């Protein structure tokens, strides 16, 4: 859905300007960041803190703007357009040139790429030859980080890219940021961005194939066993194995590949039936005090 292209060139210009600040400024920031990174990625808990930090930041966009806020308004779920004084009027009326809409759109673009930048830093430490990340934590940390990176790029593609088709797949739309480099990455076609999203999701699925959720369920509560780490519980609140497969189904559907979308979706349904991971909510769970 090509809804925000009006602001994209301006945002890229800002990014280029940011890379041309003085060397002293960059040196100071780099030094401080390197020290903080060294401390953060000293153990498994530090890696989990970095990953959880991205999940926490998501609330800033997905708590409203990219859920029940601006996007739902643009989908005409609310009767807003009739009231020209409404704070969401510009979104409802598709007035993309208005300052308020531009400001929100800029925030979406920059925030999503900021989340991606943090994930890339985390991923670079996962793959470092001197990584302190244990074999137990690595599939979860790296798998979820890759899935989140794909998820954010997919939202950027849906929002700023074209309505996908054979005629538009080669439209140049956006960069796929997959390194910690401050260099502006080349703009890619919608087809190439989608391919990189699928690549990240496939790798995430492989890493998470032994996700505890498949054997133990969502584990939606703390354990009495002191050796049962909380980091591996509450799997329904994270991009777990099933969520990655569901995201692949969404991507296939967006690309118009209904056969693979169907195959991914039905595989999740079958897996849940066989493994019983997501039971129906019992009445007393929502009515008891």
Regions found by a protein language model. Name each.
Residues 1-32:
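Bacterial Sec-dependent N-terminal signal peptides
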């Amino acid at each position: 859905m090509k809804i925000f292209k009006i602001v994209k060139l301006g945002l890229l210009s800002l990014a280029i300007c940011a890379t041309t600040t003085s060397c002293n400024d960059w040196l100071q920031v780099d030094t401080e960041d390197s020290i903080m990174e060294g401390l953060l990625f000293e153990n498994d808990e530090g890696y989990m803190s970095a990953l959880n930090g991205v999940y926490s930041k998501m609330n800033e966009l997905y708590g409203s703007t990219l859920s029940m806020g601006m996007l739902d308004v643009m989908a005409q779920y609310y009767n807003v357009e009739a009231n020209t004084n409404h704070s969401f009027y510009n979104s409802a009326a598709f007035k993309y040139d208005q300052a308020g809409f531009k400001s929100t759109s800029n925030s979406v673009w920059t925030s999503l790429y900021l989340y991606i930048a943090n994930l890339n830093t985390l991923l670079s430490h996962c793959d470092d030859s001197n990584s302190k990340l244990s074999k137990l934590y690595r599939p979860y940390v790296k798998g979820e980080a890759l899935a989140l990176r794909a998820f954010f790029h997919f939202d950027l593609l849906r929002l700023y890219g074209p309505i996908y088709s054979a005629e538009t797949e080669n439209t140049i739309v956006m960069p796929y940021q997959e390194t910690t480099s401050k260099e502006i990455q080349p703009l890619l076609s919608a087809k190439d961005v989608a391919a990189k999203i699928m690549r990240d999701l496939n790798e995430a699925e492989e890493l998470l194939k032994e996700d505890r959720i498949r054997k133990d369920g969502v584990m939606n509560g703390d354990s009495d066993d002191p050796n049962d780490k909380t980091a591996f519980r509450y799997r329904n609140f994270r991009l777990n194995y099933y969520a990655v497969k569901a995201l692949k189904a969404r991507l296939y559907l967006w690309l118009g590949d209904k056969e693979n979308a169907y195959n991914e979706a039905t595989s999740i349904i079958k897996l849940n039936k066989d493994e019983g991971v997501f039971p129906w909510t019992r009445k007393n769970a929502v009515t008891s005090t």
